Regions:
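Beta-rich carbohydrate-recognition and catalytic domains
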Residues: 1-127, 131-174, 185-235, 257-307, ...
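Repeated scaffold domains used in trafficking and secretory/extracellular systems
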Residues: 60, 176-179, 240-242
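Catalytic nucleophile-His microenvironment captured as a short glycine-rich beta-strand/loop
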Residues: 182
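Beta-rich accessory regions
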Residues: 187, 213-435
Length: 435
């Protein structure tokens, strides 16, 4: 499930992730590992971290210690330091580290573990480490029940708590998970973005990701753009635990394309769950409100080969993208040979994805309900609009207005979608992805 330790080193993107090698459902968690040169084509690698006497290997992050502050490498060959949650069978959660001297292929655990001991609470997990430009040291943010804690260290081994944030924003009682904190430049200044994943989100009662905009004073996050309503990173059902890549030029984020409500019941055999596309994050103003946008990354070479299509065009691949521009109300439909349909509705006030008739759904009582079949992103858009739809076997990722709105939805069609049709004044281009 959760992406872990996302990092870019020497032209290679590393995706570690929560992995149970013994079953297709959650269990004794390891860190799986995959690598890519382009964020689209991934190759599985040997398991990176195995459970030990401290417990399962839960979520965490990785940094490139270029100055060898940890002294686990050399100046000529700096180490990658992974920091993760050790989850003991009795529920105790503490933070541990491991280091790699071969660019992330293999890791050795520190004899100092745990480097952050539990302060006496449950749900104390998911450290996301980053360079602190204010104190010029390492910092991390981790989830602590319904809030996040901040820690600082000079060497990744000895940590001091520096602050807290939350609960704020979405006031539903639930646990925060998989936090991330990072700056994005906007009009010549850095705006700090805090992302938290929530096990239970407001009226929807499903997991979702919320973000806050503000500042980081070197010790804690300060929300400078409060909102009466939660600000969601994705309005769909199936994007959770997303975090950013370290050591990358752009701010790129990747999530788990699934929902805890039905993750253990999905009707798949060769895989269970998937990562989302990497998304390039930026800030933009929407109706005078500073807003986080997330546009798909890594698709440039495929978009260059896109071509216009007519209504009711046949699609000959299970992985493809659609670039759509239009104005006014519209309906877009992906169909297969047995009559199953994934429908997208667009208007000036909202975008709706309806998977009610999209495929096999009897595997879960949650997946079948209307509450888990129709996802909507509210918006205000007059005149022309644009969408990009990316479909990969069993997941749709929709991006509106270059990522201002996003909806991620998994579906399980009995046969591949092989036709696209629409109603409305639209211009549609198709590109195929050889993933």
């Amino acid at each position: 499930n959760d992406p872990n330790g996302l990092i870019y080193i020497d032209g290679i993107w590393h995706l570690y992730y929560q992995h149970n090698p013994n079953d297709v459902v959650w269990g004794p968690m390891h860190w799986g590992h995959a690598v890519s040169k382009d964020l689209i084509h991934w190759e599985h690698q040997p398991i990176a971290l195995y459970p030990d006497e401290l417990g399962f290997i839960f979520s965490g992050s990785a940094v490139y210690d270029t100055q060898n502050s940890s002294e686990y490498g050399t100046n000529e060959n700096p180490p990658i330091i992974a920091i993760y949650t050790s989850h003991h069978k009795d529920g105790l959660e503490q933070q541990s580290i491991a280091y790699s001297n071969d660019k992330g292929r293999h890791f050795e655990k520190s004899y100092l573990n745990p480097v952050i001991k539990n302060p006496g609470i449950s749900d104390f997990r998911d450290p996301k480490a980053f360079w602190n430009p204010v104190r010029r040291c390492w910092s991390l943010v981790l989830a602590a029940q319904d809030r996040v804690f901040f820690y600082a260290s000079q060497d990744m081994k000895n940590w001091e708590k520096t602050g807290e944030f939350g609960p704020e924003g979405n006031h539903v009682k639930g646990v925060w998970e998989c936090p991330d904190l990072f700056p994005i430049e906007y009009k010549g200044k850095n705006v700090w973005v805090l992302v938290v994943s929530m096990t239970k989100a407001s009226e929807d009662d499903h997991c979702k990701m919320q973000y806050f905009l503000g500042d980081f004073d070197g010790e804690k996050f300060l929300c400078t753009c409060p909102s009466d309503e939660p600000r969601w990173l994705d309005e769909g059902f199936d994007n959770y635990a997303a975090v950013t890549f370290q050591n990358a030029k752009d701010v790129l984020l990747m999530g788990w394309g699934m929902n805890w409500q039905y993750a253990a019941q999905t009707p798949t055999e060769e895989y269970c769950g998937q990562a989302t596309l990497a998304r390039k994050l930026s800030l933009t103003e929407v109706d005078g409100v500073l807003t986080l946008a997330a546009a798909p990354a890594g698709l440039e070479k495929f978009r260059h080969s896109s071509y216009p299509i007519e209504n009711h065009t046949t699609i000959r691949t299970e992985t493809f993208g659609l670039k759509i521009s239009g104005k006014g109300d519209a309906k877009i439909c992906l169909k297969n040979s047995v009559g199953q349909k994934l429908k997208i509705y667009v208007s000036d006030t909202k975008i709706t994805v309806d998977r009610t008739m999209a495929g096999y759904k009897e595997f879960s009582e949650h997946f079948m309900t209307e509450k888990y079949s129709i996802s909507t992103a509210a918006r205000k858009k007059d005149g022309a609009w644009n969408l990009e739809l990316v479909f990969d076997v069993s997941i749709l990722e929709l991006f509106a207005e270059d990522g201002v709105d996003a909806i991620s939805t998994v579906v399980y069609p009995e046969t591949p979608y092989d036709r696209v049709s629409w109603k409305g004044d639209l211009s549609v281009e198709l590109y195929e992805i050889d993933a």
